[in-house]
Amino acid sequence: MRITLGNTLPPYPDFVEGIRRAPDRGYTLTPAQTITALKNALRYIPTEWHEQLAPELMEELRTRGRIYGYRFRPAGDLKAKPIDEYRGQCIEGKAFQVMIDNNLCFDIALYPCELVTYGETGQVCQNWMQYRLIKQYLEELTQEQTLVIESGHPLGLFRSRPDAPRVIITNSMMIGQFDNQHDWHIAAQMGVANYGQMTAGGWMYIGPQGIVHGTFNTLLNAGRLKLGIPQDQDLRGHLFVSSGLGGMSGAQPKAAEIAGAVSIIAEVDSSRIETRYRQGWVGHVTADIAEAYRMASQAMQRREPCSIAYHGNVVDLLEYAERERIPIELLSDQTSCHAVYEGGYCPVGLTFEERTRLLHESPEQFRHLVDISLHRHFEVIKKLVARGTYFFDYGNSFMKAIYDAGVKEISRNGVDEKDGFIWPSYVEDIMGPQLFDYGYGPFRWVCLSGKHEDLIKTDHAAMECIDVNRRGQDLDNYNWIRDAEKNQLVVGTQARILYQDAVGRMNIALRFNEMVRRGEVGPIMLGRDHHDVSGTDSPFRETSNIKDGSNVMADMAVQCFAGNCARGMSLVALHNGGGVGIGKAVNGGFGMVCDGSERVDEILRSAMLWDVMGGVARRSWARNPHAMETSEAFNGSHARDYQITMPYVADEELIKKIVPYIVGK
């Protein structure tokens, strides 16, 4: 048997009107590289079609900057179906088809025709030939095999064993010398590199809900830490301003409303505003800055949650507030600055349509305008912060982009970015010490039956596993899952996000598998965002609160990936650059199918704890106080099977005496 694209050449598709399309990514290959790129694409395609398709694929490369193989895209909307409607030899093979189609459905994907799920450039795979082959391989996959995916390319099925992963994915794992945006762009054009973001290429995206709990936690804790809001109160009467209503950033208005705040979120793309408004993730829309702030002021006076989408550029929005002396309490940004020169950041003064056209016609001019806009963006934030605004980078490489645009003033040491920037990232100030250091992170699950009643049952089961008296974080998480149904978070298939620590995740996972075993619910996919305690190494986000010098090391993410492979997670993924861009992060994730078996129970008992505690242990070794407390307690409660190496903490006064003396000599 040979897996192929079949014997019938599909017709060229009619693109659905109103569905967003990715901009031209830029064609910059040499003639020799172009020849290789075309050969690379044609190797998926039977030779009898080459003469007809070679000019077509070449035109895609020339005009889109990528070869997508549009002809091979299945017609219509690729909505996730109930698992029983997919063909397969094993449950995992069918389950991952659910996840892939969910990543690419019109309600979820940013650019469905270009396989981009979210984050401007985050793809499931590179082209539709790969998609078709992956689907066929998943249909043939057995419990004795593992499917290997390398930057979207299905390398094939390889014999393994039932307690090994069914799918292993890597994306854009480039050699160090070439691990930069320029060389990656060449590799992507040539069809050998896929930017998987995090859960796009890791097949684990669940719509904007996937980040909304983390955003809710961030805003709530920012209010507690910086605005003095008591633990038992929310953000009523307080204003949050940011930008972006895309696949991840679109969580901001919903999270702010759930936290009780008033929010104004700037977005230049009207289609993204329309999507979030239609889905109920933003309450009001205006293109008038004065009206946006007026609506916000009225809602604050009434102490009512309110979300406002401003159709325009965030720089204009902030400069108006600075000029009119309108106080902004909490400020962030979620433009796609990991791809700042590829369209992820729209320069002030350009409409979204002008941005798209300029990207195609004059990428160098576009780059120049981005740099000018970033300078203005920096200057207005600096003025607002001086007046009392709390600004935090939301891990989108925003401050790194400003630094790269030539604003060295933004670096903390005035020399380079190794010590971070003058304003903290949300992980550095909030999520790191308050959540990651304890092991809390974005646990998630998908009810593969597609039944809403299964989701409600799992919500209640998860709620019963949380001890609200243990920590304040547990009470927040309990309230979150209690209100999840009321807050109407589902976009796409039936899924849920819930921040939990290591033991919490394991207990919930075991409870779910027991429910599947008893026939109370259908099979369940467990997973998490790569943006988690252990899953990602990045000094610009996930490990920005690690101060022992190891924030530039990627050992943790790689060990997490390898450990999850060894313990038998159903899917394991390792990527380059998730969230912050190529060369700036190494990130990984997993998927685990709960089929009700005792085999899965054993994997959950081992893998769920490892997946979290490996990161807590690393944070503890960096001398993060809460991680040290958590590791010490874990050593006591799990002494039979685990032992985390604990650091001895040096006396600060001793170090202050010794170092100046030696350096002075």
Feature-to-residue mapping (PLM):
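Catalytic cofactor-binding cores of redox enzymes
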Residues: 101-113, 186, 192-199, 217, ...
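General beta-strand structural signal in soluble alpha/beta enzymes
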Residues: 146-151, 169, 242, 265-266, ...
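Catalytic or ion-translocation cores adjacent to nucleophile or general acid/base/metal-coordination motifs
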Residues: 197-220, 224, 236-239, 245-303, ...
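Structural alpha-beta junctions
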Residues: 140-145, 260-261, 327-330, 383-390, ...
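Core active-site phosphate/anionic-ligand binding loop and the adjoining beta-turn-alpha structural block
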Residues: 290-508
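C-terminal domain-closing interface element
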Residues: 295-304, 309-324, 328, 626-664
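N-terminal ligand-binding/catalytic initiation module
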Residues: 1-214, 220, 224-227, 231-232, ...
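Short, solvent-exposed amphipathic alpha-helical segments in soluble enzyme
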Residues: 257-259, 322-327, 407-411, 516, ...
